A protein has these predicted regions:
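Conserved AMP-binding/adenylate-forming core of the ANL superfamily
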Residues: 36-90, 107-112, 155-156
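Gly/Ser/Thr-rich phosphate-binding loop
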Residues: 240, 267-272, 280-338, 351, ...
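Conserved pre-ATP/AMP-binding loop-to-beta segment of ANL
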Residues: 35, 149, 161-182, 187, ...
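Structural core segment of the AMP-binding/adenylate-forming
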Residues: 66, 90-156, 266, 474
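Conserved AMP-binding/adenylation subdomain of ANL enzymes
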Residues: 199-221, 226-268
């Protein structure tokens, strides 16, 4: 994107250029030479070139095709930040398949649901992931980066395939990525994104990173590549622009290790979720000079922003979006001064409004944040869920379709948008958007639980923390031991980032006359 003197001019002169035929793999891996990925191996900094990444991806693409995986099939990827993860994505895109990223810390229940709901034909994982498949219906093809029983060895298998592959001729609107996002009702929904998503993300990546790319830029985020923040906001746009991306796996985020990593790997541009920033501030890390820092997921607050400017030497640019239409609003302090307390303004190419109950745009009033369709960053649809798609993509009285975020905001007279809260039950914790239904379903499977409701409670570090209100089964004694057992059960069955950090026992839950739990009443009493 070209920089002009003002935000208004930059926005006015911007125009989308989306070709009819477009493939992510060709765009991010076939156009560049030099360093694509950087990993830290002990005390060594290792670089993977675009040529090496392309060869690995082509070998994997040919392997997938040889095993009957083809266009439109889902390829699940259950791996941490590593070279093989990027190659797996590129291979899926190359053959016209749909990449299905999954969080490496997912437990068997979460993995089983996503594999079954998507109908995945292949799974690329590691020994940790293979171990979680016991008792589950496996995809026909399982490749493991490292030896694991019942799985083909990733490197040994693809070594027998050709490093040459002709990329599929896909349309920009052909499906490419299936990411599951939390919702308030039912199981997580699969968000189906097209190949054009990479182009749609560029304005929201370039502005917060002060018009990336610039000479010497190098990107990193602790956000896993299974999430929109890691995959869509860092890995894919970084590779698209030829900017090296640092890959590193944290078993558990460590602020001192993160600061040391950024210095050792020469990071110049970082996406740091709010929780990571808060932990770094609490740890009192030494200064880490960066060219740009972006953050999103929850409000940062003046104290954290002031600290960040002092430690990183630049203003932190906040941004906002959802998996369904990511990076729509944000900041670029070198281009304009955001209104105090706001998330920023609509990025060039995005028409964002705050709508009242009649879906009419309002200014200086609270309403629902919405993004005008069509837009290249907008999802195609929810996977096999037309009813949810219809609720998300709704026409106003004039027939104009909007992507309804479910978030309440307020727009100022100059276009700055402030976030005021959510109008649903989504829990925003440490940068994750967590829906209560999946957690409640997991807890209800515990034999000691009769009823459960999950809500978010305020948390100084995470923004919100998962809180479970439980009615024990008859004859079960509530207490600390039961609470700990339920917490461990969710950690191992679902995911460590979704377990209830606090558990409360009650004799009954507040209910509506139609038998629904009144979560709002529970939140008000926290």
């Amino acid at each position: 994107m070209k920089r002009y003197a003002t935000y208004a001019e930059t926005r006015a002169r911007f125009a989308w250029d989306i070709p009819a035929r477009f493939n992510i793999a060709r765009a991010i891996c076939d156009r560049h030479e030099g360093t694509a990925l950087i990993t830290l191996d002990g005390h060594r900094v290792r670089e993977t070139t675009y040529a090496a990444l392309r060869a690995m991806a082509c070998r994997l693409a040919n392997t997938l095709l040889a095993h009957g995986v083809g266009p439109g099939d889902r390829v699940a990827i259950l791996l941490p930040q590593m070279v093989e993860t990027a190659a797996a994505h590129i291979a899926a895109y190359r053959i016209g398949a749909i990449a299905l990223p999954m969080f490496p810390l997912f437990g068997p229940d979460a993995i089983a649901y996503r594999l079954t709901d998507s109908g995945a034909r292949a799974l690329i994982t590691d020994p940790d992931g293979v171990a979680k498949l016991d008792g589950l219906d496996r995809p026909p093809l399982v490749l493991s980066v490292g030896p694991a029983p019942g799985a083909l060895d990733f490197h040994g298998t693809i070594a027998r395939a050709s490093p040459d592959h002709t990329c599929a001729d896909t349309a920009a609107d052909d499906p490419a990525i299936l990411m599951y996002t939390s919702g308030t009702t039912g199981q997580p929904k699969g968000v189906l994104q097209a190949h054009r998503i990479v182009l749609g993300m560029l304005p929201g990546v370039e502005l917060p990173h002060d018009f990336l790319p610039a000479p010497g830029d190098r990107l990193w985020t602790p956000a896993d590549w299974a999430w929109a923040g890691g995959l869509l906001d860092v890995l894919l746009p970084g590779l698209f622009h030829g900017v090296p991306v640092v890959a590193h796996r944290f078993r558990k985020f460590d602020p001192a290790e993160a600061a040391a990593l950024m210095i050792r790997a020469g990071v110049r541009n970082a996406f740091l979720p709010p929780t990571a920033l808060k932990m770094m501030r609490t740890a009192g890390i030494s200064p880490v000079p960066l060219r740009s820092v972006g953050s999103g997921g929850e409000r940062l607050g003046d104290a954290l922003l002031d600290w960040g400017r002092g430690v990183f030497g630049v203003a932190i640019n906040e941004f906002y979006g959802q998996t369904e239409c990511n990076l729509t609003v944000g900041q670029c302090h070198s281009l304009f001064t955001p209104a105090p307390g706001s998330m920023g303004r609509a990025f060039p190419g995005f028409d964002v409004a705050v709508l009242d109950l009649d879906m009419r745009p309002v200014v200086e009033q609270a309403g629902e944040i919405a993004v005008r369709a069509p837009n290249p960053a907008l999802m195609l649809r929810y996977w096999n869920n037309p009813a949810a798609t219809a609720r998300k993509l709704r026409p106003d009285a004039a027939g104009q379709v909007w992507c309804m975020t479910g978030d309440v905001g307020r727009m100022g007279e100059h276009g700055d948008i402030g976030f005021e809260g959510r109008d649903d039950d989504i829990i925003s914790s440490a940068g994750y958007r967590i829906g209560p239904d999946e957690i409640e379903a997991c807890i209800l499977r515990h034999p000691s639980v009769a009823m459960v409701a999950v809500v978010g409670r305020p948390d100084a570090v995470r923004g919100e923390a998962v809180h479970a209100v439980i009615v024990p089964a008859p004859g079960v004694e509530p207490g600390a031991a039961l609470a700990a057992a339920i917490q461990d059960y969710v950690k191992t069955s679902l995911s460590p980032h979704e377990y209830p950090r606090t558990v409360e026992f009650r004799d009954a839950l507040p209910m509506t006359v139609t038998g629904k739990v009144r979560r709002r009443d529970l939140r008000l009493n926290l």
